[in-house]
Structures are given as structure tokens and as C-alpha cells.
Amino acid sequence: MPQFLFVPGGKRSAQDFDSVRGLLRAQGRLSDAITLSDPEQNDLSQHIAEVCALVEEGDAKELHLCGHSYASFVITGAADRLRGRIARLVFIDTLIPESGRSLFDFFKQAGIDPTAFGVPAWPPFVEPLTFDEAAFAALPKTYLHCLRSQFLSLTAGIPADLQSRLASENWTYCALDADHYCMIDQPAAVVERITG
């Protein structure tokens, strides 16, 4: 039975996953969540190191690393450093990182001002992430797409993009009728998708 580690997005707290973790606990499943250090003071590399340190302290045999929003960059970077320790990555209403690009790069490509979404130019959001794309493609991955997300203008193209990559890059796609904070809005639906 897999264990789950939840990583919230920028300036958010591990408490965002309390309801999800409570439902998992009721099923006899183990989970943990981390609050990342202040994104105004620390960068993406530091956040990746924090997740790696927590994983390395534990002894999970089948760990599913789950990242919400900005944390997709964190879990991707952590999985790259922890090869063999992560069984699956779960992307919760987020962008899918590409090696050599930052979160801000995706906003720029879409012609969207990040500050309009309350995303300032803090260090983690402008630092490019570099990782082994072949190793990433080989790792099983789940994408939870929130259809009422405040960030739909950024994520609307993901279903079509993933359709061509489902089999070759080990993706599972799930749509949720939820807003961006689905783990708060619909925790039972999140649990169903990540344990099914």
C-alpha cells in the first residue's frame, strides 16, 4: 500500500491537506505533508532539498509524492534527486515542468502576467528547474485537473497535451469538478483519484 507525501503550493501550508490525510488515515493509509520555507526568502533548490530531507528521514517503500500548484516543480526536482525512492508523482492542478524552465517562463509563454494571479517574482518562481526528462517520462504520474480552477487559462491545454503522452510517458489523467484548492473543496474526490 503506497504512502503519500503532500507538498502545497507557494506560501501555502501543510494544513491544506488535513482533510485528505484524515480520509486516507480512515482507510488505514499513511501520509505526511510539509510546509515549505518562506518563498520570499528561499528558492526552488531549497524547497527541493526540504522535501528530499523529509523523504530520506523516512522508510517508505512505495512513496507517492503529491504536489499542488507551484509544488509540481518541487516534486519533480525531488524525484530527480531521489531516483528509486519515488513510486509515483501526483500533479494537482498545476503546470507540468519542463527541464530548463521556471514557473514564470510558463506565464510568459502564455502571455499572462503572473502578478494578476497573485504570483510575485519570488526566488522559487523564477528559478529554472533542471532534471532528467527521460527519467521523468519513465516515472508513473497522475494529473488531477480542476475544471473550475482560477488558473484554467494556464492549464486548459493540458488534457490535449497529455493525450498524446499518456502511454509513452506513464500518465494517468483525472478531471475534477473543483476549484484550484480541490484538496479543501473536494477532499473525498482527491482521495478517490489518488488511491484508485
Predicted features, each with a name:
Residues 66-75:
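Gly/Ala-rich beta-loop-alpha elbow adjacent to hydrolase catalytic centers
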Residues 113-141, 145-150:
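Hydrophobic, aromatic-rich cap/lid helix
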